[in-house]
Design a protein with these regions (language model features):
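Cleft-lining beta-strand/loop regions that shape enzyme active-site pockets
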Residues: 1-180
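Carbohydrate-binding/catalytic loop surfaces
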Residues: 183
Length: 183
C-alpha cells in the first residue's frame, strides 16, 4: 500500500462465503508513528510519561508532554521505559540531556576501527531538579538502557523494576555492495 502521499489506491476485499467483493478507494497519507503512549498527572505534583520507543520525534514529543505537565504543577516525574526496545541513539541522548547537568557523560561509542566518541549532556535540559523515577523491565533495551544508565550513573534518579535486557549499546549498520546492510 506504499506510495506517494495524496495518491489513491484501489482495494478489493474478497470474503469467504460472500460472492460480491468490497471495493474501496483509499487516499494515501503520512501515518505518524508516535513515541509517547501516555502523559498525565498521577498526583498533584507528580507526572507520568510513557515512551514506547526512541524515534525521530521522541525528544520533541517528550518536551511537549513535559511542558504540559509542568504547567499542571509537575515537580517530580515517573518516566516509564518498560517494554521499550530502544531506537535512535540521538533520541536517547536528547532525552538524557533533559535530566543531566552540563558535561556529564551520557554514553560513548567505540569500535574496533572507530575511535571513541563521547556524548555529554549540554546542561540545558528542562527537568534537571525534580525527583525522577525511571521504570524498567526485562524488555527495556538499547537506547532505553542508555537513558536509564546515564541517570543511574550520575545519581540523578532512581531506577525501579526488573533487570533490563542488557543491550545498552549502539549498533552501526554496515552497507554491502548489493545495497543491503547488516547490523
Amino acid at each position: 500500500l506504499r506510495g506517494p502521499k495524496g495518491s489513491k489506491v484501489n482495494l478489493t476485499i474478497v470474503r469467504r462465503g460472500v460472492q460480491d467483493p468490497l471495493l474501496f478507494t483509499v487516499k494515501r497519507d503520512k501515518i505518524p508513528i508516535l513515541s509517547l503512549d501516555a502523559s498525565y498527572m498521577i498526583q498533584p505534583k507528580t507526572g507520568y510519561i510513557r515512551i514506547n520507543r526512541f524515534g525521530a520525534t521522541t525528544a520533541e514529543e517528550f518536551k511537549k508532554a513535559m511542558t504540559s505537565l509542568q504547567k499542571q504543577g509537575m515537580k517530580d516525574m515517573i518516566l516509564d521505559l518498560q517494554g521499550n526496545g530502544g531506537g535512535y541513539l540521538n533520541a536517547a541522548i536528547d532525552l538524557a540531556n533533559e535530566f543531566l547537568g552540563q558535561k556529564e557523560l551520557i554514553v560513548y561509542t567505540e569500535g574496533r576501527t572507530a575511535k571513541r566518541s563521547d556524548f555529554y549532556a549540554k546542561g540545558n535540559g528542562d527537568f534537571r531538579n525534580g525527583r525522577l523515577i525511571i521504570l524498567v523491565d526485562e524488555y527495556t533495551a538499547s537506547a532505553s538502557e542508555i537513558v536509564s544508565g546515564a541517570v543511574q550513573d550520575w545519581d540523578r534518579g532512581i531506577i525501579v523494576g526488573r533487570r533490563s535486557f542488557g543491550k545498552g549499546l549502539v549498533q552501526r549498520p554496515i552497507d554491502l555492495q548489493d545495497g543491503s546492510m547488516i547490523r
